[in-house]
Amino acid sequence: MSTADQEQPKVVEATPEDGTASSQKSTINAENENTKQNQSMEPQETSKGTSNDTKDPDNGEKNEEAAIDENSNVEAAERKRKHISTDFSDDDLEKEEHNDQSLQPTVENRASKDRDSSATPSSRQELEEKLDRILKKPKVRRTRRDEDDLEQYLDEKILRLKDEMNIAAQLDIDTLNKRIETGDTSLIAMQKVKLLPKVVSVLSKANLADTILDNNLLQSVRIWLEPLPDGSLPSFEIQKSLFAALNDLPVKTEHLKESGLGRVVIFYTKSKRVEAQLARLAEKLIAEWTRPIIGASDNYRDKRIMQLEFDSEKLRKKSVMDSAKNRKKKSKSGEDPTSRGSSVQTLYEQAAARRNRAAAPAQTTTDYKYAPVSNLSAVPTNARAVGVGSTLNNSEMYKRLTSRLNKKHK
């Protein structure tokens, strides 16, 4: 073999399976270098071949065969280079197609955004109006007929409840009468207690207040609050719930006359078996209900107080006369005048005095009918000075007031 055959570089073939860009580039660079070396070595080989041909004809034939082999190798390398480039382009095309498919949604989104931004304000406004018309609920107009039907329905509901309350009260009365006659303690009146939650739920609704009062449901409330045939009061839960509901209802005088509820509430204010909390609530209801009857105002400023002039001399004379009368009574009865004071003693205080022991003071309630008339003249507002010397004026007014009071006490 010739030196050209020995020194011929090996071409690195790239398989179609190798799809990486770095390996393809390295093979292309190696082929370019090999071609350059082959081109530089061709003149030397031709010169050697001519010299050998002159020396030996057989060597000339060998050189020609070596040149033909080199040309065939170069053509094969060029064909491999073309094959490598085509393989590279096929892989790239597949990747580019995949990337184009993934980028299509983003391009479409951008195009839709551009169309939305390019839309005119008028078209956008029309679209918003259409959406508003679709989403907006139609207004339901109530007619007079619907209102009448609603009132009629509420009236029927209250009347049904009234009948149920009357039936429950009558069943409890019958149960108690049978218990009294037979002496069977197992008979318990529970009908009103079972119906109580329904009654409280209706009475506590503010929108049904007028319907309750107009349909005289207070009459059934009165029947529930009345004492039972054996003299006992209804259960505490019934009393508490019904009084709380009555406190929230706007009861008027005509409703009290029609239902007769006022007499039962007065009974609860006077009975000693009623709880203190319920008794106070009953007194509050009576005060509110009787105020419009007697024409009294609930405003304290409108309250009229009877006034009388206070005469200290007259009071002193009266106290002296009362003390003299008490001494005469004590002397006639033979008791020690010092054992009892000028005031009238109670039985407890008299018993303590007989045992020569001190009596605990008893709580007394004083109720005044008349208020004393104020005899102090109003101090003018301009009498008080502001600034330097204001304290002097205050002290002078204080002296005047004290001197006037001292004169009256004398």
Swiss-Prot record:
GO biological process, one term: regulation of transcription elongation by RNA polymerase II
Nucleus keyword on record: yes
Record-listed Phosphoserine modification sites: 23, 40, 85, 89
Transcription regulation is among the record's keywords: yes
Keywords for this protein: Nucleus, Phosphoprotein, Transcription, Transcription regulation
Subcellular location(s) of the protein: Nucleus
Gene Ontology CC annotations of this record: nucleus; RNA polymerase II, core complex
Residues with the Phosphothreonine modification: 15, 86
Signal peptide positions (record): none
Pfam families documented for this protein: Med26
Annotated stretches, region: Disordered: 1-132, 318-346
Basic and acidic residues bias (residue ranges): 53-65
Biased composition (Polar residues): 20-52
Any one GO MF annotation of this record: chromatin binding
PROSITE patterns: TFIIS_N (PS51319)
Stretches assigned to the TFIIS N-terminal domain: 219-296
Function: Transcription factor involved in RNA polymerase II transcription regulation. May function in both SPT15/TBP post-recruitment and recruitment steps of transcription.
Subunit structure of this chain's protein: Interacts with ABD1, RBP1, SPT5 and SPT6.
Extra remark beyond the main annotation: Present with 2830 molecules/cell in log phase SD medium.
Similarity section: Belongs to the IWS1 family.
Protein known as: Transcription factor SPN1
